[in-house]
């Protein structure tokens, strides 16, 4: 999510002798009284209006030294780094003529697609209307126009071929003005999905709106077909403005239910009618039972890599397949299958990592757990067992950005041993022994401790985007020397706007409790005084593979609560959270709802021992998985919490999606893990809400965590005759957007102020 550095090693009172504290003060308070008198606290209106939001700059790379970007006046501009020249390739007038909100340049630079009429569907998916603009004659392409609305559209990597998905079928155009060639014919709404994922694959496996992939030179097009014919359907009412509500139906496999059947096909787009789509075989050890397809990576035009998972998700198989021209088929020999298995949890982190192939087109780099249980980069040439470990240590490699002939760029949380930081590293792989350099560790060190990067072709240039803890900044760098070339975005307006704001202080610390490390971020009022007592709000997510304690910049609702309302807010990363090794990550395997809750409670007790927390005014709140954890913490019977809020909580793992739930819990069957499914519900603890103030919130059109979850909590509380508060948002999904957002945060603020006896 979201400077001077000070290390404090404290020896505390006898009550906390077991507590080791390491502290970074991220936002020191201003000390000049004359300045303080002219400064104001944050207001809720500031947050709801997005007054202090920041900008980032990610170049839209189109070559090794060129990128596109949209200027402040909405012209599409091409910038050449080496010449320093820029020119407008598409005017704002052309964009405005079709109300375009997005664009895409064809690789041959002859055409641009313009996207308008954006209509959101689920988390990543949306439909839109597309227009093709011919840059050579300055006119829109007429004749054989694209149908509308389109579910997905993309250019081939070379030339100006187009592939698009319309009404769940895939179409191909050799040129934008040509008639389309229909590749699939069996697409049906909510039944068969071609080239786009169904709900569960979009949300829980692919994390994209598309399921088709061009080969590097555009010869082949691979795509997934998802068959949801036998999947149970979730149905909910959408009230709208009509006399009768309409019913939304989504094929949605819950834990233990039948899953979509997935198949992968590849078609030669040069002569698509000649042979037609060819199916890629599934590895035998995967195909013998229920399985998932997890990703596809093209290696060359005639070599492709597919990744598969068993339904249990502790075994992943990477399969490298080659095109056999004589048979016009794809061959996936067993000798090119690489197996990744976890014996202590699930395979990978949240997802199984994807390979980054080297220039020999057979060996690759991949992140997976080493023998010490930390996720690191490995080089695989023949088998996973013979993999060469590239990085090592009690920290984790996060992402491989780019591999060139002589360098590998990646991110990790190694520097100074803070798991909530991200720095960019370069390893020289063209020399022996390989040398490692941290590109970002000492760049604007006080301001920037959390980076990501975007690379041009061959890593000739790259952009760094720093997310904090100071105000975010985006910069352009030479990929050979790492020298900074220019600042792309430094958020000067935001910096000036914050000069007269009393921001809260932020500290990142860690607790060592019973051989478990609990990192936490504490947000303190601007005039914080350790001799005083403050109300405490715990903000929790706590889901497997998540991380809340990060060195990022944010001015948000909890910033306001600290700045204006004088609350202390804490975020704690307990067992099950990511980037601190498998021991912590896999501790929650097959027992969700236990250690995540225990660790929040443990942290609260340690906070009380620090002496500045009013133990009679402690609250907890969370959203989604965080709503589940906050509910269980409130119902723990500890007496620690006076009140709490759950927004769109899961209430029983039998109600949630199969792909996500079974990854961490196994199956809800008697011979697997049904007992813990039953024991981990919020409803089973209804009686324990009697001594807390509980606010339950949900959107009625939540496609992700269904309203069913909160309805069952409410029913259990009513049956137990427990008083509680509830707020629902009609026709709102999991994100509670638009005017609902303002209402939500205003309502939650009133609830907390009433709980803590704070005046309006």
UniProtKB/Swiss-Prot annotation:
Extracellular topological domain ranges are 26-760
Expression by tissue, per the entry, reads:
Expressed in adipose tissue. Expressed in the dermal fibroblasts in the fetal skin. Expressed in the granulation tissue of healing wounds and on reactive stromal fibroblast in epithelial cancers. Expressed in activated fibroblast-like synoviocytes from inflamed synovial tissues. Expressed in activated hepatic stellate cells (HSC) and myofibroblasts from cirrhotic liver, but not detected in normal liver. Expressed in glioma cells (at protein level). Expressed in glioblastomas and glioma cells. Isoform 1 and isoform 2 are expressed in melanoma, carcinoma and fibroblast cell lines.
- Entry-linked InterPro entries: AB_hydrolase_fold, Pept_S9_AS, Peptidase_S9_cat, Peptidase_S9B_N, Serine_Prot_S9B/DPPIV
Carbohydrate attachment residues:
49, 92, 99, 227, 314, 679
The record ties this protein, via SUPFAM superfamilies, to: alpha/beta-Hydrolases, DPP6 N-terminal domain-like
Keyword terms: Angiogenesis, Apoptosis, Cell adhesion, Cell junction, Cell membrane, Cell projection, Cleavage on pair of basic residues, Cytoplasm, Disulfide bond, Glycoprotein, Hydrolase, Membrane, Protease, Secreted, Serine protease, Signal-anchor, Transmembrane, Transmembrane helix
Catalytic activity field: Hydrolysis of Pro-|-Xaa >> Ala-|-Xaa in oligopeptides; Release of an N-terminal dipeptide, Xaa-Yaa-|-Zaa-, from a polypeptide, preferentially when Yaa is Pro, provided Zaa is neither Pro nor hydroxyproline
- Description of activity control: Gelatinase activity is inhibited by serine-protease inhibitors, such as phenylmethylsulfonyl fluoride (PMSF), 4-(2-aminoethyl)-benzenesulfonyl fluoride hydrochloride (AEBSF), 4-amidino phenylsulfonyl fluoride (APSF) and diisopropyl fluorophosphate (DFP), N-ethylmaleimide (NEM) and phenylmethylsulfonyl fluoride (PMSF). Dipeptidyl peptidase activity is inhibited by 2,2'-azino-bis(3-ethylbenzthiazoline-6-sulfonic acid), diisopropylfluorophosphate (DFP).
Effect noted on mutating residue 657 to S/T: Strongly reduces endopeptidase activity. No change in dipeptidyl peptidase activity
Entry's EC annotation: 3.4.21.26, 3.4.14.5, 3.4.21.-
The segments annotated as topological domain Cytoplasmic are: 1-4
Instruction: Give the disulfide map.
Output: 321-332, 438-441, 448-466, 643-755
Could you state what the record's PTM comment says about this protein? N-glycosylated. The N-terminus may be blocked.
Describe the pH profile of activity. Optimum pH is 6-8.4 for gelatinase activity. At pH lower than 5 inhibited gelatinase activity.
List GO terms (cellular component aspect).
Answer: apical part of cell; basal part of cell; cell surface; cytoplasm; extracellular space; focal adhesion; lamellipodium; lamellipodium membrane
Its domain of life reads Eukaryota
Transmembrane intervals:
5-25
Question: According to the UniProt record, what happens if one changes residue 657 to F/V?
Answer: Reduces dipeptidyl peptidase and endopeptidase activities
Tell me which family the UniProt entry assigns to this protein: Belongs to the peptidase S9B family.
Q: Which PANTHER family match?
A: PROLYL ENDOPEPTIDASE FAP, PROTEASE FAMILY S9B,C DIPEPTIDYL-PEPTIDASE IV-RELATED
* Protein name, UniProt field: Prolyl endopeptidase FAP
């Amino acid at each position: 999510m979201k400077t001077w550095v000070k290390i404090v090693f404290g020896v505390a009172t006898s009550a906390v002798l077991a507590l080791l504290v390491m502290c970074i003060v991220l936002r020191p308070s201003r000390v000049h009284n004359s300045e303080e008198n002219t400064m104001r606290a944050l207001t809720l209106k500031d947050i709801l209006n997005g007054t202090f939001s920041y900008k980032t700059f990610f170049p839209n790379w189109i070559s090794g030294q060129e990128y596109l970007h949209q200027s402040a006046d909405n012209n599409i501009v091409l910038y050449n780094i080496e010449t320093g020249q820029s020119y407008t390739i598409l005017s704002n007038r052309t964009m405005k003529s079709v109300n375009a909100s997005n664009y895409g340049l064809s690789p041959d630079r002859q055409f641009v697609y313009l996207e308008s009429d954006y209509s959101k569907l689920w988390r990543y998916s949306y439909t839109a209307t597309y227009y093709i603009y011919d840059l050579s004659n300055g006119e829109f392409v007429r004749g054989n126009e694209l149908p509308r609305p389109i579910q997905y559209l993309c250019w081939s990597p070379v030339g100006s071929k187009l592939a698009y998905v319309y009404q769940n079928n895939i179409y191909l155009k050799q040129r934008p003005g040509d008639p389309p060639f229909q590749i699939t014919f069996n697409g049906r709404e909510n039944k068969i999905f071609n080239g786009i994922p169904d709900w569960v694959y979009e949300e829980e496996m692919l994390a994209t709106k598309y399921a088709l992939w061009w080969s590097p030179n555009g010869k082949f097009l691979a795509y997934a077909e998802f068959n949801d014919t036998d999947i149970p359907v979730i149905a909910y009412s959408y009230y709208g403005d009509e006399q009768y509500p309409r019913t939304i139906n989504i094929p949605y496999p819950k834990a233990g239910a039948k899953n979509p059947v997935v198949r992968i096909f590849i078609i030669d787009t040069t002569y698509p009618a000649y042979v037609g789509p060819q199916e890629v075989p599934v590895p035998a050890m995967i195909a013998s039972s229920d399985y998932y397809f997890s990703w596809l990576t093209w290696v060359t035009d005639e070599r492709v890599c597919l990744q598969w998972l068993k339904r249990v998700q502790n075994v992943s198989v990477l399969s490298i397949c080659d095109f056999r021209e004589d048979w016009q088929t794809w061959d996936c020999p067993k000798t090119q299958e690489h197996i990744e298995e976890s014996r202590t949890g699930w395979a990978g982190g949240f997802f199984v990592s994807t390979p980054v192939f080297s220039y020999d087109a057979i060996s690759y780099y991949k992140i997976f757990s080493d023998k010490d249980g930390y996720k690191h980069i490995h080089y695989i040439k023949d088998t996973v067992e013979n993999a060469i470990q590239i990085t090592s240590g009690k920290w984790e490699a996060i992402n491989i950005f780019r591999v060139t002939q002589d360098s590998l760029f990646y991110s990790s949380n190694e520097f100074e041993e803070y798991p909530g930081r991200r720095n960019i590293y370069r390893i020289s792989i063209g020399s022996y022994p390989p040398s490692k350099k941290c590109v970002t560790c000492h760049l604007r060190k006080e301001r920037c401790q959390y980076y990501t990067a975007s690379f041009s072709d061959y890593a000739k240039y790259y952009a760094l985007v720093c997310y904090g803890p100071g105000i975010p900044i985006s910069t352009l760098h030479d990929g050979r020397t790492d020298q900074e070339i220019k600042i792309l975005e430094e958020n000067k307006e935001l910096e000036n706007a914050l000069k007269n704001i009393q921001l809260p202080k932020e500290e990142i610390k860690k607790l060592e409790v019973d051989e478990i490390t609990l990192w936490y971020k504490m947000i303190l009022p601007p005039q914080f005084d350790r001799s005083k007592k403050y109300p405490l709000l715990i903000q929790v997510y706590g889901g497997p593979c998540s991380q809340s304690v990060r060195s990022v910049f944010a001015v948000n609702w909890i910033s306001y609560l600290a700045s204006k309302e004088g609350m202390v807010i804490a975020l704690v990363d307990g067992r099950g959270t990511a980037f601190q090794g498998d021991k912590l990550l896999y501790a929650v395997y097959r027992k969700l709802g236990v250690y995540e809750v225990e660790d929040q409670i443990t942290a609260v007790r340690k906070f009380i021992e620090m002496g500045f927390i009013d133990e009679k005014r402690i609250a907890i709140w969370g959203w989604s998985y965080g709503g589940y954890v906050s509910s269980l913490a409130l119902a723990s019977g500890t007496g620690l919490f006076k009140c709490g809020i759950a927004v769109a909580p899961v209430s029983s793992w039998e109600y949630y999606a199969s792909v996500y739930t079974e990854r961490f819990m196994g199956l809800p069957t008697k011979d697997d893990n049904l007992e813990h499914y039953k024991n981990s519900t919020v409803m089973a603890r209804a009686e324990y809400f009697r001594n807390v103030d509980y606010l339950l919130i949900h959107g009625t059109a939540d496609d992700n965590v269904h309203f069913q979850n909160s309805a069952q909590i409410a029913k259990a509380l009513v049956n137990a005759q427990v008083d509680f508060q509830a707020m629902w948002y009609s026709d709102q999904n999991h994100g509670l957007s638009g005017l609902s957002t303002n209402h939500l945060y205003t309502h939650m603020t009133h609830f907390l102020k009433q709980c803590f006896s704070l005046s309006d």
